[in-house]
C-alpha cells in the first residue's frame, strides 16, 4: 500500500492527523469530557464530514474543507477512497486485525440525490444509498440506521441515533461505522495482571488491574517530559502495520498540556514515535474499556465549522430539492468504544451526519508505569491514518 499513496493523499493524511489532534485538544479542554475517559474516531468523523463537503457549495464547502484541512474537496475524496479500499480493508482472513468500515446515505423519499453526489458516494466512499420515509416512519428509520451500525460494529455501537432524534422534519442522514479488533504481536500474560494504584487528576487514587510485560524490551521513547509506548498488532498478509500508542506525560496532571502541545505542533507526534525497542525494568499498563458518545456540533463549531449548521448553509450539490428552503446540519452524533486487555484491542465507532529526524539514544534500561492519566491513539503506521484516539483518567470508568 505504501507505493499506492500519492503525494497529495499523504498530505491529506497529514491534515487528517492534525484534525484528530485538534479534536483531542478540544475534548481534553472541555471540563465535562476532561473529567471522564473519552474516545473518538478521527477517521470516522473525517470521512462523514468529507462526504458532507461533497454535497456542499460555495462558502459552506470552503469552510468544511478548511476545517478538514484537505486543501481542496477532491483531496478529501481521494483520501476517503484510499482509506476505504486499503487502510480499513479487513485482514482477519490472513491472521491480521478484523476491520470493518461502512458509509450510508439515508435520504427521504421526497428528495432525490443528485446523480453526481450519489456516484461519488458510491464509488469513492463505497456508501450505501437508501430512500427512506422520514415523514411517516421516522421511528422505523431510526431503528433501521441503528441496526445497520450495530451490525457493522459487531454490536458495540447500538444506538447511534438516540430515540426521538429523527422525526418527520428530517430529510437526510449521513452515517458511517467502524470496527477494529486486533491481537497484540506480543500478548500479555493474564497471570501477570495485578491490582495496583492509579492516581487521578484530583490527587486521589483507585486500585485497578495493571498488565505487566514478560518481554525484556518494548518500543518506548522518552523526551520532553513524555514517554510513548508503541504496541504493534499482529499483521495479515499485506504491508499494513496497526499499532496502539500510549502517550504518558511525566507530570500526573499533564494530560491537558500534552493535548495542547500535540495540537499546536504538527510534527510533535511523529517526533516522539518510538522507532526501536529498549530494555525495560518495570512495566505496568492498566486495562481499560471506554464507551463514549457525544453530540459533536458544538465541538466542530469550536474548530470553526459554523456555516453547515446555519440557515445560510449551501448543500445544493447533494439533492435536487423541491423545497423552497435548503438543507442544513442539525446534529452530528458520534460514539466510540475501545477496550484494551491482555490479548489486544477491540474498538468501534460511528458518526452520523518518510525521512524522519533521528531520536536521541534511549537509556539502556527504562521504566514504563502508566499509573496516571494518559492519551492513547490507534493508527495504521504505513499510511499514518489515525483510527481512534482518546484519554484515560480513570481505568475503572467504562462510560
Curated annotation (Swiss-Prot):
It holds the Pfam family Serpin. SMART domains: SERPIN (SM00093). It comes from the Eukaryota. InterPro entries: Serpin_CS, Serpin_dom, Serpin_fam, Serpin_sf, Serpin_sf_1, Serpin_sf_2. The record marks 358-359 as: Reactive bond. CDD domains: serpinP_plants (cd02043). Keywords: Protease inhibitor, Serine protease inhibitor. Disulfide bonds: none annotated. One of its GO terms (cellular component) is extracellular space. One of its GO terms (molecular function) is serine-type endopeptidase inhibitor activity. Residues 344-368 are annotated as: RCL. Belongs to the serpin family. The reactive center loop (RCL) extends out from the body of the protein and directs binding to the target protease. The protease cleaves the serpin at the reactive site within the RCL, establishing a covalent linkage between the carboxyl group of the serpin reactive site and the serine hydroxyl of the protease. The resulting inactive serpin-protease complex is highly stable. Inhibits chymotrypsin and cathepsin G in vitro. This is Serpin-Z1B.
